[in-house]
Amino acid sequence: AYLDFLRAWLKDKAYVALAYMTGILPVKKYGSHSALNMFTEYSMTNPREMAEYFGFTEEEVKELCEKYKRCFEEAQAWYDGYELVAVEAEKKRTYSMYSPKSVVDAMLSGIFDNYWNQTETYEALKIYIQMNFDGLKDSVIRMLAGDLIPINIGTFSNDMTTFQSKDDVLTLLVHLGYLSYRWTDKTVAIPNKEVAQEYINAISSMDWNEVIHSVEASKKLLEALWNMDGETVANGIDKVHQEIYILEYNDENSLSCTIHLAFYFAREYYTVIRELPTGKGFADVCFIPRKSYADKPAVVIELKWDKEAEGAIKQINDKNYVAALKEYHGNLLLAGINYDKKTKKHSCKIEKLKL
């Protein structure tokens, strides 16, 4: 009824020169069309030429960090991750967008923390991610592990009650800010450390015990890595693989998902990079210490599928993966991790280098 009122009030009326409306969601659809098709819509999935105004841009955050003497790298880890694309003169321009309220709170307080729950509550997120749609739980777990999930945003009805599939739920989470949408490849991801904490808060009060156990155990697993305790690392990865049923292996990519979830706590100290470019290929996983944690060792992890962990270490050395970390002057750990199909066990070999 309200949409009918707006349409009758605004559509094709001579007395309306311009109407400007704001809201969290795009206008409700009737079938595949907007109920108010006289509006041009700007949204998180299609910001058009307004992309740079959806939040703070990276340059604006850098200026704020300089003004308030805050660490930009920490601001990036906590509040970046939203990728908005505008098309200017037939050229795509991508903006890294930051959550404004959280950035302001961090600048004024000097503390990088989760300010999300001052305006939203994880209870709202919890309602959506535990809906009974095929593949929804799997997608959330994979995104916690750092995966990008393909999505079709075209079926979303632009409301908070009508859902036909997991894609509709995930599209809503994009509009609510719980996911970042990559327009270039039509995928979604959890944008940053702040929002990831909201997922953990929500899951901790649900029956996803296997995920919470893995996240809680990841702190000790990271310590075992630092201590070069390959056996403990291998056993910890075994446990994550056994507990989380979606992590079925068929290649090194699926092994990578397990590793990222097993070392979830690494994000507390590191920028975690998948497939870091090197002189002779790509290192599978790299942990690069943020400036605030420069005392932590950098880590290069090479993954093998049904081979030998020692062979992974050899590949790191042969392909000179460490060259990509030449600007890091602390300790460097090399970790080779292999999964044996016959024994269904992981093995881990860890070596230490001084750059």
PLM features per residue range, with description:
Residues 259, 283-287, 296-307, 319:
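Conserved catalytic cores of phosphodiester-cleaving nucleases, focusing on short active-site segments
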Residues 309-329:
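Basic, amphipathic alpha-helical patches used to engage nucleic acids or provide basic targeting signals
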Residues 11-16, 291-293, 327:
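Conserved catalytic network of the ASCE P-loop NTPase/AAA+ motor domain
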Residues 324, 328-355:
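Domain-level recognition of nuclease-like catalytic cores that cleave nucleotide substrates
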Residues 267-294:
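Active-site metal-binding core of divalent-cation-utilizing nuclease and nuclease-like domains
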Residues 263-271, 327-329:
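Short secondary-structure junctions
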Residues 28-34, 309-312, 342-349:
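Switch/connector loops and helix/strand junctions flanking conserved nucleotide-binding motifs
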Residues 1-249, 266-269:
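Phosphate-binding site recognition
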